[in-house]
Amino acid sequence: MAGRTVTRVDLCEAVYQKVGLSRTESSAFVELVLKEITDCLERGETVKLSSFGSFLVRQKGQRIGRNPKTGTEVPISPRRVMVFKPSAILKQRINANGAMPMSTEESDENTAQSASGG
């Protein structure tokens, strides 16, 4: 289900096309918004964008993991992770027209997994 990847440049171009700011102003605007979101998350704040979703930071405690190659137990340090929770409106919009058709590659992967029992 991999689609096109949208980059910062694409976002800046969209602002330029739809808002009417210059390309320089559009780029500065996008960078400012992304910096503000980043700064809030670094401070541990939740960023809630109505009708879109929320970005939040969760604290994960130390735990014991396992090295997949050797099977030996290894400690995993406590850390903070960023989580995105989409809003119900965004979920509805994404699923409004049913599931997107799978790419050929994804279809082949699912077929191979089904055949192998996994």
From Swiss-Prot:
State a single Pfam family of this protein: Bac_DNA_binding
| GO MF terms, alphabetically ordered | DNA binding; structural constituent of chromatin
Under the cellular component aspect of Gene Ontology, which terms does the record hold?
cytosol
Q: Which terms are listed as keywords in the entry?
A: DNA recombination, DNA-binding, Transcription, Transcription regulation, Translation regulation
Q: Which GO terms describe its biological process?
A: DNA recombination; positive regulation of metabolic process; regulation of DNA-templated transcription; regulation of translation
The region called Disordered is annotated at: 97-118
Summary of subunit composition and partner proteins? Heterodimer of an alpha and a beta chain.
- State the function annotated in the UniProt record: This protein is one of the two subunits of integration host factor, a specific DNA-binding protein that functions in genetic recombination as well as in transcriptional and translational control.
Could you say which protein family the record assigns here? Belongs to the bacterial histone-like protein family.
The name this protein goes by in its record: Integration host factor subunit alpha
